[in-house]
Amino acid sequence: MLKLVDLEKKINSELTTKIRNSEIKHNQIYVEIEKDNLMDVVLFLKTNKNTRFSQLIDITVVDYPEESQRFKVVYLFLSHEFNQRLILNYSINENEVINSLTSVFPSANWMEREVFDMYGVIFKNHPDLRRILTDYNFEGHPLRKDFPLTGHTEVRYNEEEKKVVSEPVKLEQNYRNFDY
């Protein structure tokens, strides 16, 4: 079993041209790559006898609206065999399409759907990329920092029409303090 420092060196030596940066923090390896290298890096991490990161724990996104590359896509991997964790990330522009990991990790399916639903990141070659947490007619992506806290519409049951209706949000402004 490789120590964490040796494992980081091994990954860097094998993937020299594909890794932008790596470091060890909080007893985990953090690796930054370019988005075009995702599949090569993930396949290496999963199949190499010295790494064996066989479980994809999570996929998430961090929104930096002020940056030129607005989103940082973050993948968390676990090697059961070596009891190690690795966090892989890369940055993308708002409208970039990225590769789906569902062909390598079938568990990525719902994780990628959640990222699509909450942030609007589109995954190429995903077998079923549709909303998973919000309604199909929901407007916007609620975890983006530019999404209004109250949302765009209010959904409620209308007793007179005997059905669920969607209306623009109406908020009283009388008691709000706009002096930031």
Q: Residues of each region from the PLM?
A:
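Terminal low-complexity/charged segments
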Residues: 1-180
